[in-house]
Design a protein with these regions (language model features):
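Terminal low-complexity tails and localization/encapsulation signals of metabolic enzymes
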Residues: 7-145, 149, 156-171, 182, ...
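Extended, amphipathic, non-transmembrane alpha-helical segments
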Residues: 174-180, 402
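Rossmann-like NAD(P) dinucleotide-binding subdomain of oxidoreductase/dehydrogenase enzymes
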Residues: 185, 215-367, 418, 489
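ALDH superfamily catalytic-core signature
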Residues: 286-292, 312-314, 318, 325-472, ...
Length: 490
């Protein structure tokens, strides 16, 4: 006879007991079957491992496999990093790519001399990953000319054919998984898990927009004919789109907006973030290998001046931008001030993401979600948690548990599997975050920081930080890094 007698304080034990009662109350549970007089004791005493081994293989036809969970497109392939048979060969292949040198340059570059900028690891500023060859002013103009010339033909190709090319690109992305994972770690400072998720999101974008091309751009829509006439409505591309992407999702967002524009029949001139052009260069090359014409999807790497020149050109029919609110406003003013047709601006910008926790919340669940949201990817996500409001009744206990979870994080080289939090993207980002933390410290409110590892000074590491404050209104701008602000409310 075994007696199951959990002990603890009311606040810790109650939620635990409720979960256990729900589990044990299920019809299939051991406790429920043991109380059933019609179930023989011999059935209860069987070895569950032996029972499973004796079962015939069976697949429930109503439950789709992971690759088929989306009815209209194939799901991206995952990688089980908990399986040594998967992980160890992957790590060996990534080690072979450690010293590979990558280059990002304009799709159609001239023979003229241009600035060559080194791209270094954000976690080791002495280690060069590759080089970026910046786009010259006249090369920007020529790129837009090429894109404009081919756009009518690309649009006439039709949704079905464009979808086939985007799906071929998605397949090539998965074939080059090792290259993308290596670059995401070395150029963008992402942990291996974050790199896997980034690649999957990019592949999903390509397949999603391929499906949209088929759905919306293959057949015209038949409209009513009030007097017996036939009316057809068909959708077409607007022209040349400029896609300007950020460094925090250097693959997923970089490929997502061009995929949408290409699917709709537009051609694209893409300007990646100056910190992460190598990932973008590989993505564009694979799209060309998949059959997308070079003139239809062009890479224009460089600093912010390249983006300014692109958006000021009156031949640009639309801009898809992801980045800061200030830059989006500048692009909006630039588009409004130029002579030419009114251009579309699709801008995804920043903000302050908040979570409100009341006294009914389960502390363990809150801790797990808060630590993951605030500090995963070193807080460099537009969806990262910035401000946590906790009800006064549970504030001290909840904050104590969150600080415990925050202390358990491993900070360091993102190329190491054990790392939870890697670097921020560059020295400018690090300096900005450190200035914000210093200002909050001067205000006299509590600030908790993790200690950094030895060698952190070689890279752009910011210690995960928790800052207590009075209100979200105390924040004047988004602080894009591993910083969580907490507020007590009644």
């Amino acid at each position: 006879v075994r007696i199951y007698a959990p002990t603890g304080t009311h606040k810790d034990l109650l939620a635990y007991l409720v979960r256990r009662l729900l589990e044990n109350g299920a019809n299939s549970s051991f406790v429920n079957r043991m109380a059933d007089a019609e179930v023989p004791a011999s059935d209860l005493a069987t070895d569950p491992v032996a029972d499973m081994a004796a079962l015939e293989p069976y697949r429930n036809p109503t439950i789709p496999l992971p690759a088929d969970i989306f009815a209209d497109r194939r799901n991206s392939a995952g990688i089980d990093l908990s399986d040594p048979l998967v992980l160890e060969p992957l790590q060996e292949r990534l080690a072979e790519l450690e010293n590979k040198h990558w280059v990002a340059e304009p799709t159609f570059k001239s023979g003229s001399e241009a600035e060559i900028a080194p791209i270094n690891k954000p976690h080791d500023l002495t280690a060069e990953v590759g080089t970026r060859r910046d786009t010259l002013d006249f090369e920007v103009e020529e790129a837009i000319t090429r894109a404009q010339a081919i756009q009518p033909g690309w649009d006439r190709l039709g949704g079905e054919r464009r979808a086939v090319l985007l799906e071929a690109a998605a397949d090539l992305f998965e074939e080059h998984t090792d290259d993308f994972l290596s670059l995401c770690q070395r150029e963008a400072g992402k942990t291996l898990m974050d790199a896997v998720l980034e690649l999957r999101e990019a592949v999903d974008f390509l397949r999603f927009y391929a499906n949209e091309a088929r759905r919306q751009f293959t057949r015209p829509i038949i409209l009513p004919g009030p007097t017996g006439e036939e009316n057809r409505l068909s959708l077409h591309g607007r022209g040349v789109f400029s896609c300007i992407s950020p460094w925090n999702f250097p693959l997923a967002i970089f490929i997502g907006t061009p995929a949408a524009a290409l699917a709709a029949g537009n051609t694209v001139v893409a300007k990646p973030a100056e910190q992460t052009p190598l990932i973008a260069a590989l993505a564009v090359r694979l799209c060309h290998e998949a059959g997308i014409p070079e003139e239809a999807f062009q890479l224009l790497p460089g600093a912010g001046e390249v983006g300014e020149m692109i958006t000021s050109d009156p031949r640009i029919a639309g801009v898809a931008f992801t980045g800061s609110t200030q830059t989006a406003q500048a692009i909006n003013r630039s588009l409004a001030s130029r002579d030419g047709p009114i251009a579309t601006l699709i801008a995804e910008t920043g903000g302050q993401n908040a979570m409100i926790v009341d006294s009914t919340a389960l502390p363990e669940q809150v801790t797990r979600d808060v630590v993951a949201s605030a500090f995963q990817s070193a807080g460099q996500r537009c969806s990262a948690l910035r401000v946590l409001y906790i009800q006064d009744d549970v504030y001290d206990e909840m904050l104590r548990m969150i600080r415990g979870g925050f202390e358990a994080l491993t900070i360091g080289n993102p190329e190491h599997l054990a790392t939870d939090v890697g670097p921020v993207i560059d020295p400018d980002a690090k300096s900005s975050l450190e200035r914000h933390i210093a200002r909050r410290k001067k205000g006299g409110r509590p600030v908790w920081r993790r200690r950094l590892h030895r060698g952190a000074n070689a890279g752009c590491f910011v210690a995960p930080t928790i800052i207590e404050m009075d209100s979200i209104l105390d924040l004047k701008r988004e602080n894009f890094g591993p910083i969580l602000h907490v507020v007590r409310y009644r």
